[in-house]
Amino acid sequence: MAAHTIFTTTSTTNSFLFPIASSNTNSAPSLSSSFHGVSLKVKSKTPQSLTLSSVTSPKPFIVFAATKKAVAVLKGTSNVEGVVTLTQDDDGPTTVKVRITGLAPGLHGFHLHEFGDTTNGCMSTGPHFNPNGLTHGAPGDEVRHAGDLGNIEANASGVAEATLVDNQIPLSGPNSVVGRALVVHELEDDLGKGGHELSLTTGNAGGRLACGVVGLTPI
């Protein structure tokens, strides 16, 4: 890479002649100048080149990826309860780890709802989180609510454990899910394909068994 040139200044010396009176009016004039007298040295400034390598370069600005983590503790009016953790690295997808107990064996709709309001139990958490104004669908569908997380399956002991990865439920930014509520439902979510009048809004997943507000937690 060719060196860049930066101009600085340094001192050099120029000479100027100042006339002085001569005591001999009959002297012939000098052939080298119309003046004669003493010289005075005056400093002036001329540019001098300096390569960029001799200048201290600023240190690069480094941005570190930030990991964010949140948790929701689910409770309801029945014996259904659970803990859900959400983790996001930088601006990547969010990983959701679910463990819920007290469920009937089988599939249960699992959604993120718009509000973190549980003053009236899970009913006051509002509809599915849907910032794009789309209809209900499966997690892998192009047309879906951001809060459509599909189904979780409870075993014969009523325990559902699952790990979900989704890129529509970030923990920061304008569509952050922090402060909203996770809800587990009574029935299987038909993923918008059941043909029921509620299929395109709730997946016809039935009642809300337990819910919890998503809150940030230390890493």
From Swiss-Prot:
<dbReference type="InterPro" id="IPR036423">
    <property type="entry name" value="SOD-like_Cu/Zn_dom_sf"/>
</dbReference>
<keyword id="KW-0934">Plastid</keyword>
<feature type="binding site">
    <location>
        <position position="136"/>
    </location>
    <ligand>
        <name>Zn(2+)</name>
    </ligand>
</feature>
<feature type="binding site">
    <location>
        <position position="145"/>
    </location>
    <ligand>
        <name>Zn(2+)</name>
    </ligand>
</feature>
<feature type="binding site">
    <location>
        <position position="128"/>
    </location>
    <ligand>
        <name>Zn(2+)</name>
    </ligand>
</feature>
<feature type="binding site">
    <location>
        <position position="113"/>
    </location>
    <ligand>
        <name>Cu cation</name>
    </ligand>
</feature>
<feature type="binding site">
    <location>
        <position position="185"/>
    </location>
    <ligand>
        <name>Cu cation</name>
    </ligand>
</feature>
<keyword id="KW-0809">Transit peptide</keyword>
<comment type="similarity">
    <text>Belongs to the Cu-Zn superoxide dismutase family.</text>
</comment>
<dbReference type="GO" id="GO:0004784">
    <property type="term" value="F:superoxide dismutase activity"/>
</dbReference>
<feature type="binding site">
    <location>
        <position position="111"/>
    </location>
    <ligand>
        <name>Cu cation</name>
    </ligand>
</feature>
<keyword id="KW-1015">Disulfide bond</keyword>
<keyword id="KW-0560">Oxidoreductase</keyword>
<keyword id="KW-0049">Antioxidant</keyword>
<keyword id="KW-0862">Zinc</keyword>
<feature type="disulfide bond">
    <location>
        <begin position="122"/>
        <end position="211"/>
    </location>
</feature>
<protein>
    <recommendedName>
        <fullName>Superoxide dismutase [Cu-Zn], chloroplastic</fullName>
        <ecNumber>1.15.1.1</ecNumber>
    </recommendedName>
</protein>
<keyword id="KW-0479">Metal-binding</keyword>
<comment type="function">
    <text>Destroys radicals which are normally produced within the cells and which are toxic to biological systems.</text>
</comment>
<dbReference type="GO" id="GO:0005507">
    <property type="term" value="F:copper ion binding"/>
</dbReference>
<keyword id="KW-0150">Chloroplast</keyword>
<dbReference type="InterPro" id="IPR018152">
    <property type="entry name" value="SOD_Cu/Zn_BS"/>
</dbReference>
<feature type="binding site">
    <location>
        <position position="128"/>
    </location>
    <ligand>
        <name>Cu cation</name>
    </ligand>
</feature>
<dbReference type="Pfam" id="PF00080">
    <property type="entry name" value="Sod_Cu"/>
</dbReference>
<dbReference type="InterPro" id="IPR001424">
    <property type="entry name" value="SOD_Cu_Zn_dom"/>
</dbReference>
<comment type="subunit">
    <text>Homotetramer.</text>
</comment>
<dbReference type="GO" id="GO:0009507">
    <property type="term" value="C:chloroplast"/>
</dbReference>
<dbReference type="InterPro" id="IPR024134">
    <property type="entry name" value="SOD_Cu/Zn_/chaperone"/>
</dbReference>
<feature type="binding site">
    <location>
        <position position="148"/>
    </location>
    <ligand>
        <name>Zn(2+)</name>
    </ligand>
</feature>
<keyword id="KW-0186">Copper</keyword>
<feature type="transit peptide" description="Chloroplast">
    <location>
        <begin position="1"/>
        <end position="65"/>
    </location>
</feature>
